[in-house]
UniProtKB/Swiss-Prot annotation:
Residues 576-587, 1270-1283, 1705-1719 have a biased composition (Polar residues). The gene is Tspoap1. Residues 649-716, 1616-1684, 1755-1822 form the SH3 domain. One of its GO terms (cellular component) is mitochondrion. It comes from Mus musculus. One of its GO terms (biological process) is regulation of neurotransmitter secretion. Required for synaptic transmission regulation. It probably controls the recruitement of voltage-gated calcium channels to the presynaptic membrane, and modulates neurotransmitter release. This is Peripheral-type benzodiazepine receptor-associated protein 1. Coiled coil: none annotated. Residues 57-97, 281-318, 560-628, 726-785, 1084-1107, 1163-1219, 1243-1302, 1322-1476, 1492-1617, 1704-1755, 1812-1846 are annotated as: Disordered. Belongs to the RIMBP family. SMART domains: FN3, SH3.
Length: 1846
């Protein structure tokens, strides 16, 4: 009987099998069992798990040893199903059974197995397989849980709970099935074997007990596992809470590893328990007793031979029947029953525990599902939040993209607006065109009518012709009769016929000569055919045309470095010339004089050029210095056309000084204008139109309007000097030779670049098919000037050893003396004169290689350049240029040259692959400009094949026609030193002028690759001065200031740059100039020294004045010329005092006309002189004159040259109605003075930076009427720079400046326009209103006409003028010598340093159309000659930016009761003989100002003009201003300040409008000055010139310069009252004052320092004061008076020396202050000239100093409303913007006191105090309280309206 294995105790892990935990203990054969051990019950136990293929981590060996023994008859079913063999034994200590019991048990087991068929086992195995698969799935899921996140773990736990529930259900089913099987087995076993019932019952009880025991143990194990699961759930909840609190970034996976470990252990325990239950349930039915004895060879539980430890069931269930003895049976049955009972109990307990575990697992599964749901919700929430974050990022990105798109769309909108504006302007132009077309249609109809009339008339004529033919037939018949009569006289007539034949032959010869000349002249046509004609001489051959004020060819040094370095094509290029001068002819308009000063300076500079190491080292294209030196003369570049064609438009060459985009300008038709690029050349046709525009053409062929103030005329001398040698004479007939000016954009030759980039040459047709050449011959290249060369060399026939050549003669008429033919540079053949242009060259080896054949022409002028006519012949000959080399190399330019393979071809030039303008035929050089220093370049020269002509094989490939060359420009070094340094006497005694020739700089301002910043003047190696202008050419120094120069021997000049200074220039001796400078001055015009911050000297030249009748042959050193003998005689008489003799206006007009006639008479005389004497004569016939900065003396010369000229007597007692009289004596000298004035006016027109004023247009109208420029139109010191326009007058041949560069520099440095007409500078709205008022109040006379019976009075600087509608009269005056000496600077207007450069790199406004001239404005222009500009200390620097307006005045009442202000003068002091001059020269009598809210107005009532000529005005007179009233009339309120009010144009980049009187602020730091301009009204066509920005040179810190002082003697200060002033700012006269003697005569002081002042300020705005024991001048705009009650307090203050800073801070505005001004409360006023307004009422004299305003006026406050936004940092041009208050429109600002002189209130806003501009405020002005109630509002509004600025 098989032995049943015993189940191990629960928890006994040592007895477990390796495939089950815990393992079942086996019953061993021969061992008994302890009583109480129950075998497990089959019923209710879970099925055994199939462990086949499973590996468990835990295993333990069974206790004891296996009893050996063979096993036989194994159970096949057990083997197949993989169940453990029952024969396997596991020893258990303490358990053993006897042999009988084993036999009984084996037998029982055999019976028990009967009926235990295969079917239940298969089902169990199937269930076990499913369980195995589920276990595998659970294991995989468990592994996935380890790897996955916590939510996945919860899902797995939920799934495991479901699996546990399923397993529990399966376990129940298996248990029920096991019970059924047990019952069946018990019936089967008990049926065949009769057993006592007690044994069976005992067995059943034992099994039941065993089962109950097993179940209890299983339940306890499951309970433990439930506790573990609960702990795991708690941990899961904790983890879930952490996850919800911390989020993704938190440490939610902190204990995941422990959790996974615990979960695995729990699952393993559950599986272990389930397996244990299953194994018990499986083995309990298999316990029948084993049969003992030999009949049972194998025992159950015996280990198999090959597999120890495995039990194999024996297949002896059916066969042997074992019969046991009765006692043994009973004993065995009892044991089995007891064991069975135990097993049953154990099974029951395990079942209960399993059910509990199942319930527990279900609960855990539910919790796990809830946790997983929560986790899933959190995951979903997390994903949703992350999605929202992603969406937010996406939205931000889209927002940024939308912003970019919005910006782009905004830009597109702006461009569309601009385009729409352009289209609108085009539409308007099209409307004009349509209107014009309608007019044309009407005209066409009219022409058709006229045509019909003409046709009828033609029929009548034809009828008349028919009648005439009939009459002719009749006459013929009569003729036949007459012939018969004449035959009789035929013999007598034959002699006459022979005579006539001789005359005919002579006429034929003359005609042939004329035809030849005509042919030659066609080759050199006039100005109408410039673009297709040649330059050079006219058709007169060797006979030059007469000269007339033409440019004299400048002497050039052929080998000089300047010629090497100047770029060909640049205006300053000077090419070698022959002795024959360039031939020019007169054109139809007046010509300018020759550049006399330039020619003279060249005569002296040529000496230094030889010795200078580098004269012009950087050949840049558009050098500022060279361009400004270009004399703007009217001499045409080409020969004049015949008389019949003189009326056509002539062509001139202009240079664009600034870039200009018409679409950015204000004009309505920008498409009709040409865009300009700085440095570009433009062809100009005809004269300037009334709008200030030229008709021009660019190099690319585009034509349109060109603003005249953006371009500058290029003089003929410079053009001729830039031409190639064959172009400067009459040698070449090709058309586009002038187009070299367009090369490279700025006059640069091929490869040159302008500032706007490379410009292609204009496509022009040449008669011979030649291409353009942009470069003149470099030094040493090309033949000498004016030597024609042969053209178009060709090979007629080529043999093996000979070649036949032919060429064309030079097209110019030249005395040919033969030809030389060279082969490879060797002379091979010489041809004599008159030989045909052919040659046969023999004995030439043409097969070995190419030979270079060239032809040289031998003429009377010399030999031509053989390379101009050359050709390569022989084997391998081609067109490729050879010997490509660098001819000259600098840091920024390079010249290349080559030997052309065929001179008939043009050559394309490439630089770094970029195409440059080509070199035309017969040119073998090119110049590259604007290169970078130290840069590698590659140049390529390619021969261009003509489109039609013979081609050779291989010519189609460019590489067969090109040669390349690489070069590296020189590195940038120090700039070059200036040339031609000279120390000369200045234009007045005590003034020394140091002049030099500025270095050549390009458009970027660089020389030798570095930027030029200025020049430094050294005296014997010690620096004495710096000039901060790269284009400055001279500087004036006062001898008394430069004591160092009196001890030194020579002066040198160095060029300054950021990288250092250049080497010294050639020194210039000082002693001769010092000796001459100390002599009395002749006709001299002082040139100012610039302000320290600008430091740009103004050029000044002092050429002599000569007479045309004395052509001097030998030039005199520059600046030391004397006058001619005739003038010297006059000059020797000295000035004499003569009473003024009045003259009528008619006499004045007659004098002007006589002068203009004399000028016209002089020009032909000059032109008829020979070419040789013209240059020296013009060089000697010069007059010392201003360089564009000093106001010339109208109608007279000045200084010692002033002879017995007519003068003006000072009008005493206010007698203004007496007309200004003209002396009849010395009219010749006065006419000469007119010439001088006119020339000065023309000089001032050289600058393209000047304003094209409406005033100038009026003068042009007057000029057209009178034929001469009126003396009133002279150039003012304040910067009335008038540029040259088409209608300029005949230039004066006696006055010329050193160079246009100096004129331009001077004009740049001058202050803004000070003396202009009211129309020019008045506010547009105000002007319109005033015009309306005038139109209402004076319906009689118009604005452009005036009754001659009402003479118009005006003050001239040194002279007076009385204007009439038809033109001004001339009023020369003769000042006294002493007066001239004392007031020399007053007369000449020496302005030192207060010139402000307005250029800033861009031009001024374009001109507007003319308007009807106002005679009053003519007088206004005459008022300023002696004004502040004309004095040595004209205007404090505070107001340099302002443009006060001086309007003309007229005496007498006009209809409507509108009184014109008159003028009155009084001079209580000063010597009587000087009264006539002093009264006119005093700034007091020449400055008319508006004193807003001043006592002058209040006292004057209706107002009147009082022009005081007091030599020493009091403080009450605000800088020479007169009390001015305002006209009564309806109040007109300006709608608001202009957008450009106080805008810093140099910062905002907005166009600055010139011409307006800017009421600048003068109270806070002195650097504050408004620099604004006027917006001119549109002309009829609506076109305006482009508005430009003004550029104000910044000052260092907040310092400013003191005004210049006049040399007047101050009265003794001991006799004057003592006053105490406090310094408002630091002042160092050495660095801040423009006066030459500032260091000696002016006092330095610091801010807050107390100064002792004696008396009142002088006419120049300076006090005489004392500081630190030193006495000197103190500028009034730098100090303020301290109110002191007693002399003791004054002395105490002076002992203190300084005021505390807090006192100065409190005194910064109009608030409480310890100091006060003598004129207005608050900060002291600055001497300024404000805008003049028209006055009502008779002329009144200023009663005296105005009374001080009561202190109550300072304390009065009133609220005012801001009308506009104002930000001082954006809208204020002043330097101290922190002193001004920012505010918004609508803010209520409390203002204190009255408005200051600058239009500012002192106000308070939000607790902050500062200055507030009055024209930004609304509400009644505070000045209304002091005016009459009836006019307060009107006057307030009018005051504010007048302060609106642009």
């Amino acid at each position: 009987m098989e032995q049943l294995t015993t189940l191990p105790r629960l928890g006994d892990l040592g007895a477990m099998e390796p495939w089950a935990l815990p393992a079942w203990q086996h019953w061993t054969q021969g061992q008994g069992c302890k009583p109480g051990d129950a075998s497990p019950s089959i019923a209710g136990t879970p099925t055994a798990l199939q462990v086949k293929g499973l590996r468990f981590e835990e295993s333990s060996k069974p206790e004891g040893a296996h009893s050996p023994g063979p096993v036989g008859n194994t159970d096949p079913e057990a083997t197949e199903t993989g169940l453990p063999k029952l024969g396997q034994q596991a020893e258990s200590p303490g358990y053993s059974c006897s042999g009988l019991e084993e036999e009984e048990a084996q037998a029982y087991k055999a019976k028990f197995n009967i009926g235990f068929g295969d079917r239940p086992n298969l089902e169990l195995l199937r269930a076990l397989g499913e369980l195995q698969q589920r276990c595998t799935i659970l294991k995989e899921e468990n592994q996935m849980l380890r790897k996955s996140s916590f939510p996945e773990t919860e899902e797995k736990v939920r799934r495991l709970k479901r699996k546990n529930a399923e397993l529990a259900v399966i376990a129940k089913r298996l248990e029920e099935r096991a019970q059924k099987l047990q019952e069946t087995n018990m019936r089967v076993v008990s049926a065949p074997v009769p057993r006592p019932g007690s044994s069976l019952e005992l067995c059943r009880k034992a099994l039941a007990r065993q089962r109950a025991r097993d179940l209890s143990e299983t339940a306890s194990a499951l309970l433990a596992k439930d506790k573990q699961i609960a702990a795991l759930q708690r941990e899961c909840r904790e983890l879930q809470a952490r996850l919800s609190l911390v989020g993704k970034e938190g440490p939610q996976w902190l204990h995941m590893r422990d959790f996974d470990r615990l979960l695995r252990e729990s699952q393993r325990e559950v599986l272990r328990l389930q397996r244990q239950i299953a194994l018990r349930n499986q083995r309990e039915p298999l316990r029948p007793a084993r049969s003992p004895g030999p009949t049972a060879p194998s025992r159950v539980g015996a280990p198999a031979p090959g597999a120890p430890g495995e039990a194999v069931l024996q297949d002896d269930v059916e066969s042997p029947q074992v019969v046991l003895r009765e006692p043994e049976k009973q004993q065995r049955v009892q044991q089995l029953e007891s064991e069975l009972c135990k097993k049953r109990k154990k099974c029951e307990s395990l079942e209960q525990e399993a059910r509990k575990k199942q319930r527990r697992c279900e609960e855990l599964e539910l919790q796990l599902r809830a946790a997983q749901n929560e986790n899933a919700r959190l995951v979903e929430e997390n994903s949703r939040l992350s999605g929202r974050a992603t969406e937010k990022e996406q939205v931000e990105w889209e927002n940024s993209e939308l912003k970019g798109q919005l910006l782009g769309v905004t830009q597109e909108r702006d461009s569309a607006l601009l385009k729409s504006q352009g289209l609108q302007s085009k539409l308007e132009s099209l409307e004009q065109v349509l209107k014009h077309m309608r007019e044309v249609a009407q005209r066409r109809q009219q022409l058709e009518v006229e045509h019909e009339q003409a046709r009828l008339s033609l029929q009548e004529k034809q009828e008349e012709v028919r009648r005439l033919q009939q009459a002719q037939a009749e006459a013929k018949r009569e003729h036949e009769g007459a012939v018969q009569l004449l035959e009789s006289t035929l013999d007598s007539m034959q002699a006459r016929v022979r005579e006539l034949e001789g005359q005919c032959r002579s006429q034929t010869e003359r005609f042939s000569l004329l035809a030849q000349e005509l042919q030659a002249f066609r080759l050199h046509p006039g100005p109408l055919d410039l673009l297709t004609s040649a330059l050079g001489c006219s058709a007169l051959g060797d006979h030059p045309p007469p000269h007339c004020c033409c440019s004299i060819p400048q002497p050039c040094q052929g080998s000089g470095p300047k010629d090497l370095d100047l770029p060909p094509g640049s205006p300053g290029r000077c090419t070698p010339k022959s002795s024959e001068p360039a031939l020019t002819t007169l054109t139809g308009i007046p010509r300018r004089t020759a550049k006399k000063a330039e020619s003279l300076s060249n005569s002296s500079r040529s000496e230094s050029i030889h010795n200078s190491p580098k004269s012009c080292p950087t050949p840049e294209v558009d050098t500022a210095s060279e361009v400004e030196e270009l004399e703007v003369d009217s001499v045409s570049l080409l020969p004049a056309a015949p008389e019949s064609h003189s009326g056509g438009a002539r062509i001139q060459v202009f240079l664009a000084r600034y870039s200009y985009n018409p679409f950015e300008g204000p004009n309505e038709n920008p498409e009709a204008e040409l865009p300009l690029t700085a440095g570009e050349y433009i062809y100009i046709y005809g004269n300037m139109d009334e709008d200030g525009f030229f008709e021009g053409e660019l190099m690319d062929g585009r034509r349109g309007l060109v603003p005249s103030n953006f371009v500058e005329r290029v003089s003929d001398d410079d053009l001729l000097s830039t031409l190639p040698r064959e172009l400067a004479d009459s040698s070449h007939s090709s058309g586009p030779e002038l187009s070299f000016l367009s090369g490279g954009g700025g006059g640069c030759s091929s490869g040159g670049q302008s500032s706007g980039g490379r410009s292609q040459p204009r496509p022009e047709e040449e008669a011979a098919g030649d291409e353009l050449s942009l470069s003149p011959p470099p030094e040493g290249l090309g033949e000498p000037l004016a030597v024609p060369y042969p053209r178009h060399i060709t090979v007629l026939k080529q043999l093996a050893h000979s070649v036949v050549l032919a060429w064309e003669l030079p097209p110019e008429r030249v005395d040919l003396r033969g030809f030389h033919i060279f082969v490879n540079g060797e002379l091979r053949q010489a041809l004599g004169p008159g030989v045909p242009p052919k040659a046969v060259l023999e004995n030439m080896d043409l097969r070995t290689g190419p030979l270079h054949v060239s032809v040289q022409a031998l003429t009377s002028k010399g030999s031509s350049d053989p390379l101009r006519c050359c050709l390569a012949v022989g084997a391998g000959a081609g067109v490729v240029p050879s010997q490509l080399r660098i001819h000259r190399l600098t840091a920024t330019s390079a010249e290349i040259a080559w030997v052309p393979g065929n001179s008939n071809l043009a050559h394309a030039i490439y630089l770094n692959g970029e195409e440059c303008p080509p070199a035309r035929p017969s040119t073998y050089w090119a110049t590259f400009c604007n290169l970078r220093p130290g840069t590698l370049y590659q140049a390529r020269v390619e021969a261009q094949i003509p489109s039609q002509g013979p081609w050779e094989p291989g010519w189609e490939r460019p590489e067969q026609r090109a040669a390349t060359l690489q070069f590296t420009t020189l590195p940038a070094g120090l700039p070059d030193a200036p040339l031609d340094v000279q120390a000369e006497p200045g234009p007045s005694p005590g003034i020394l002028m140091i002049s030099w020739l500025p270095v050549t700089i390009d458009a970027a301002g660089t020389s030798n690759g570095v930027r030029v910043t200025g020049y430094a003047i050294y005296a014997d190696g010690q620096k004495i001065m710096e000039v901060a202008s790269p284009t400055a050419g001279s500087v004036l120094v006062e001898v008394s200031q430069l004591q160092l120069l009196q001890a030194c021997h020579e002066v040198t000049v160095r060029t300054m740059s950021p990288h250092g200074e250049s080497s010294d220039s050639i020194p210039a001796p000082v002693a001769p100039a010092l000796a001459s400078a100390c002599q009395p001055a002749r006709m001299s015009c002082l040139s100012p020294r610039p302000s320290p911050e600008v430091r740009t000297p103004l050029a000044s030249v002092s050429p002599g004045l000569g007479d045309t009748s004395f052509p001097l042959r030998h030039p005199v050193p520059h600046g030391t010329q004397d006058f001619s003998a005739s003038l010297s005689i006059e000059m020797s008489k000295g000035p004499q005092e003569e009473p003024p003799v009045p003259c009528s206006q008619e006499e004045a007009g007659a004098a002007v006309r006589s002068i203009s006639e004399e000028k016209r008479a002089i020009e032909p005389t000059l032109g008829q002189e020979g070419p040789e004497p013209v240059a020296p004569s013009l060089a000697k016939q010069e007059v010392e004159c201003t360089s564009g900065d000093a106001g010339p003396v109208p109608c007279s010369t000045q200084g010692e040259l002033t002879q017995k000229k007519p003068s003006i007597e000072a009008c005493h007692g206010g007698d203004l109605d007496s007309g200004l009289k003209l002396r009849s004596e010395k009219e010749d000298m006065s006419e000469l003075g007119v010439h001088l004035v006119n020339s000065l006016v023309d000089h001032s027109r050289n600058s393209d930076l000047s304003d094209i004023q409406e005033e100038e247009e009026e003068e042009e109208e007057e000029e057209e009427e009178l034929g001469s420029r009126p003396c009133s139109s002279q150039k003012q010191v304040a910067g009335n720079s008038i540029r040259e326009n088409g209608a300029k007058p005949q230039p004066d041949p006696f006055c010329e400046t050193d160079s246009d560069e100096e004129i331009l520099e001077q004009i740049l440095e001058l202050p803004l326009q000070r003396l202009c007409s009211k129309k020019l500078f008045s506010i547009p709205e105000e002007e319109e209103e005033e015009e309306e008022e005038e139109g209402l109040e004076k319906p009689g006379p118009s604005r452009t006409s005036q009754d001659p019976s009402q003479p118009e009075l005006a003050l001239l600087g040194p002279g007076c003028d009385s204007s009439q509608p038809q033109g001004p009269g001339l009023c020369p005056l003769s000042p006294e010598l002493s007066g001239v000496r004392e007031h020399l600077e007053d007369v000449l207007g020496v302005v030192g340093g207060n010139g402000r450069r307005r250029g800033g790199g861009s031009p001024e406004k374009l001109p507007n159309r003319k308007r009807p001239q106002d005679p009053r404005e003519h007088c206004s222009r005459l008022l300023g000659n002696g004004g502040p500009q004309a004095s040595a200390r004209p205007v404090p620097p505070r107001e340099r930016g302002s443009l006060p307006v001086i309007e003309g005045t007229r005496v007498g009442q006009e209809p409507g009761g509108r009184g014109r202000p008159g003028l009155s003068r009084r001079c209580p002091r000063g010597p009587a003989p000087e009264s006539s001059l002093v009264s006119c020269l005093s700034p007091k009598c020449l400055e008319i100002s508006i004193e807003y809210d001043s006592e002058d107005e209040q006292e004057a009532g209706s107002g009147g003009v009082s022009i005081n000529s007091s030599c020493y005005p009091t403080d009450g007179e605000a800088w020479g201003t007169a009390a001015v009233g305002r006209p009564r009339g309806p109040p007109k309120v300006n709608p608001g300040p202009n957008a450009y009010l106080r805008l810093p144009a140099w910062e905002k980049g907005e166009p600055e409008r010139r011409g307006r009187s800017a009421i600048g602020r003068t109270k806070e730091p002195p650097s504050r000055a408004t620099e604004t301009g006027e917006s001119r009204g549109q002309d009829n066509s609506g076109r305006r010139g482009p508005q430009r920005r003004g550029a104000r040179v910044p000052r260092s810190g907040t310092t400013e310069l003191a005004p210049p002082r006049s040399p007047q003697e101050a009265p003794p200060h001991q006799d004057l009252p003592v006053r105490v002033f406090v310094a408002l700012f630091d002042y160092d006269p050495v660095s801040m004052s423009p006066n030459p003697d500032a260091g000696e005569e002016e006092l330095p002081f610091k801010e807050g320092q107390l100064l002792k002042v004696f008396g009142d300020k002088d006419a120049d705005g300076f006090y005489r004061g004392e500081s630190g024991g030193r006495t000197g001048y103190i500028p009034c705009n730098m100090v303020a008076e301290v109110a002191v009650d007693s002399p003791a307090g004054r002395q105490q203050l002076l002992q203190r020396g300084f005021l505390p800073p807090n006192v100065l801070t409190e005194a910064s505005g109009n608030g409480p202050s310890v100091y006060s001004s003598a004129h207005t409360p608050g900060p002291p006023p600055k001497p300024r000239r404000s805008k003049k307004v028209e006055l009502e009422g008779p002329t009144q004299l200023c009663p005296g100093p105005p009374k001080l305003i009561h202190s109550a006026a300072q304390k009065t406050s009133r609220p005012m409303v801001a009308a506009f936004d104002y930000n001082p940092r954006e809208n204020s041009p002043n330097m101290d913007v922190e002193a001004e208050l920012p505010f918004r429109a609508g803010d209520v600002i409390t203002v204190f006191g009255n408005m200051d002189d600058d239009g500012f209130y002192y106000g308070e806003l939000n607790g902050q105090r500062g200055l507030v501009p009055s024209n930004f405020l609304e509400g009644p002005g505070p000045e209304s309280g002091s005016l009459e109630s009836g006019t307060s509002q009107a006057e307030s509004q009018r005051t504010r309206r007048r302060r609106v600025q642009c």
